[in-house]
């Protein structure tokens, strides 16, 4: 596992503290994202996309987002024994510094795959996969010590139910971890209120406005926020381009922060990036308004990139954005001045040391791919990214990865290239 270039919690760490900042569990998908489509293809027709990107998806969206912000992240997930599984494992562990000690490789089980097609700032998806051969609770066993865990609440498997796939979060909570929770879309339309009964064990709940209003049976995001705040110490409701609002009963704070104005290209994973930013702010003990502002800025940076999980910003991206905002404040009107005042706290946070550029999604599954670099022969080690000041970092959007830039050669790696210590578990027979 590579070493993170910047640690925003360095001053908070003690020798006896938890090994990890965040522990996660879930399903990792291989995401293939097509961009620049003029329209969805009609039946019996074929169209060409202007660009494409391949990257780990699912719970990997959140793992990469937290790790890129400098949070020491551990992930428990099942990985297939196919090339897609190799790619996702390698990307998470070697490229994104995510600990996979609680993850497992399973023989004869293929990786779940999602194909996402972006049209007019919206997206449609097709997914295929099978349940993991082993429940998360069995794969994890005793979770590692962490400052926080992030879970998705489910009406079918509540946090405190014995045998639930989420009971690992309860074990982590007993060992001192704060539980940050979100919730998924309910395709049944039932939106059972029993989900909210699980909030008594959570530190924070971070649904979007649609989900919050549906579960609380309210008509406005603010009414939903107040209803949630009666059940959990920290209530957060995100509202897309409108911003986010929150109540922290542990500090007595209430805040609303508008989102920065950006041209959104791909909303994939924006909620995960927001959550990662909010968790960092909470662990750093920032004021509530700063937590919301930082999380909103991270999400705004992510939606300007194609490529799912690898669109998540790193500290170099945040530093570059803040420097641009600060320099433009004097000649960009009231909005620019307001933005600079709102984010002035970043002056004490952005790295003062060089940090490496984060990587964006490449078009195809490639073993050697780097920002501004070229693939190395299979007999030589991959060139490490050059460390440079944040303002000089380059990125490679997914739309450039298939056509506008020289194509990366496909992997020619042999089985000897794989880590022999990677745990592999035989699949359970049906």
Predicted region positions:
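Short, small-residue alpha-helix embedded
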Residues: 63-65, 71, 213-214, 265-292, ...
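A structural motif shared across PLP-dependent enzymes of the aminotransferase-like
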Residues: 31-35, 55-56
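Short pre-catalytic strand/loop immediately N-terminal to key active-site residues, enriched for Gly-Thr
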Residues: 46-55, 257-269, 288-290
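Ribokinase/PfkB-type carbohydrate-kinase core domain
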Residues: 1-30, 89-105, 117-256, 286, ...
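Short, flexible, mixed-charge acidic loops at enzyme active sites
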Residues: 34-42
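Substrate-binding N-lobe of the ribokinase-like
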Residues: 5, 9, 22, 42-113, ...
